[in-house]
């Protein structure tokens, strides 16, 4: 189950690139089932220039996107989906519980709960220092 992917290996699986690649490393990967990744949130993030200049907070939508990218790595590691693209198909039950600020290390965990055909559902949780920052149910659709 333990499988480490650095940024270069992540870029071989998902098409995201700077400034929209929001995962620095994957530390756990169970192919087609689950993954855990990390994002080191620094004061140099482009989005802090406008969100918010006097009180920088990582936008919740980008936390969800980071979770979706980890989910994409998990689902695209499944043999039948290798080399394809995972699209964000939907989001349910999103909750934001803690601000994410410069200096935080965002732990991004996803468990794929259902895969049927080219669609999947995952339970996603983002934490900082063991405290839940955001959680949601994410839906994926596999493209070409």
From Swiss-Prot:
<dbReference type="InterPro" id="IPR010084">
    <property type="entry name" value="FabZ"/>
</dbReference>
<dbReference type="Pfam" id="PF07977">
    <property type="entry name" value="FabA"/>
</dbReference>
<dbReference type="GO" id="GO:0006633">
    <property type="term" value="P:fatty acid biosynthetic process"/>
</dbReference>
<comment type="function">
    <text>Involved in unsaturated fatty acids biosynthesis. Catalyzes the dehydration of short chain beta-hydroxyacyl-ACPs and long chain saturated and unsaturated beta-hydroxyacyl-ACPs.</text>
</comment>
<dbReference type="GO" id="GO:0016020">
    <property type="term" value="C:membrane"/>
</dbReference>
<keyword id="KW-0441">Lipid A biosynthesis</keyword>
<keyword id="KW-0443">Lipid metabolism</keyword>
<dbReference type="GO" id="GO:0005737">
    <property type="term" value="C:cytoplasm"/>
</dbReference>
<protein>
    <recommendedName>
        <fullName>3-hydroxyacyl-[acyl-carrier-protein] dehydratase FabZ</fullName>
        <ecNumber>4.2.1.59</ecNumber>
    </recommendedName>
</protein>
<keyword id="KW-0963">Cytoplasm</keyword>
<dbReference type="InterPro" id="IPR029069">
    <property type="entry name" value="HotDog_dom_sf"/>
</dbReference>
<keyword id="KW-0456">Lyase</keyword>
<dbReference type="GO" id="GO:0009245">
    <property type="term" value="P:lipid A biosynthetic process"/>
</dbReference>
<dbReference type="GO" id="GO:0019171">
    <property type="term" value="F:(3R)-hydroxyacyl-[acyl-carrier-protein] dehydratase activity"/>
</dbReference>
<comment type="similarity">
    <text>Belongs to the thioester dehydratase family. FabZ subfamily.</text>
</comment>
<keyword id="KW-0444">Lipid biosynthesis</keyword>
<dbReference type="InterPro" id="IPR013114">
    <property type="entry name" value="FabA_FabZ"/>
</dbReference>
<feature type="active site">
    <location>
        <position position="51"/>
    </location>
</feature>
């Amino acid at each position: 189950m333990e499988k480490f992917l650095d940024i270069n290996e992540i870029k071989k699986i998902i098409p995201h690139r700077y400034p929209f690649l929001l995962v620095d490393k994957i530390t756990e990967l169970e192919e087609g089932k689950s993954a855990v990744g990390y994002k080191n949130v620094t004061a140099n993030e482009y989005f802090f220039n406008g969100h918010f200049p006097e009180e920088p907070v990582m936008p919740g939508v980008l936390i969800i996107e980071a979770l979706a990218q980890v989910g994409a790595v998990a689902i695209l590691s499944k043999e039948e989906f290798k080399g394809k693209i995972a699209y964000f198909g939907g989001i349910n039950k999103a909750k934001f519980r803690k601000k994410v600020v410069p200096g935080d290390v965002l732990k991004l965990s996803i468990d794929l709960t259902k895969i049927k055909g080219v669609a999947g559902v995952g339970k996603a949780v983002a934490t900082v220092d063991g405290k839940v920052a955001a959680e949601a149910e994410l839906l994926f659709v596999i493209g070409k």
